[in-house]
Amino acid sequence: MINTPTNPLAGKHLVFLGSSVTYGSASGGESFADFIGIRNHCRITKEAVSGTTLVDEGSDSYIARLKKLDRNEKADIFVCQLSTNDASLKKPLGCISDSVDMDRFDTKTVVGAVEYIAAYAGAVWDCPVVFYTNPRYESEEYDRMVALLHRIAAKWNITVIDMWNDAVFCALDTAEQAWMADSIHPTRAGYLEWWTPYMELALWALLT
């Protein structure tokens, strides 16, 4: 990728919120977010802490860290990871609220936390809000989270980059299986060769 007028991400500021997959825990602390910044000559803010949850419990939760981001700094796209930690820890899913009032969302549930993040980011930065999923792995809990995310997206008019339900994307051959360090975390090669081009195309589409 080069910095040309045909690259809609060039010169933009992208904010990424997440946990170990956004951080790049199996890739030396570099993930697709970093590679998108380099390849597209855009600035990124990567707020990612391994092991953290959407559900608002403690100072490292997604919401706690979201509130520490600079509200006055312009963002062109806000991207949030649908955390696998909430599924692994079996956090309560909750229900989609009838309200659009952030103060009424139950952020001790996955749904309430996702709604809060979507509402907050949209209100603060007035930019496209994106949630992305992991590719498919064995988890009934995460499958339910993805289904609920699509319903939340319809309510809030946000974008879902859904690797979970992309059968072609998830179908790795024997050699490509080395792109995953485990069932959840990509390797550096996995980010570079597999995730980054996919995410780039989805993010490009938001600005064209």
Mark where each language-model region is.
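Helix C-cap/helix->beta junction micro-motif
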Residues: 40, 124-125, 156
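Catalytic His-Asp segment of secreted/periplasmic serine-dependent ester chemistry enzymes
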Residues: 134-208
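Catalytic phosphate/metal-binding cores of nucleic-acid and nucleotide-processing enzymes, i.e., regions
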Residues: 2-10
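Active-site segments of SGNH/GDSL-like serine hydrolases
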Residues: 81-85, 115-149
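Conserved SGNH/GDSL esterase-like catalytic core that processes O-acyl groups on lipids
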Residues: 10-15, 21-104
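A short acidic, glycine-rich active-site loop
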Residues: 99-110, 184-186
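Short hydrophobic segments within beta-strands
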Residues: 17-18, 132
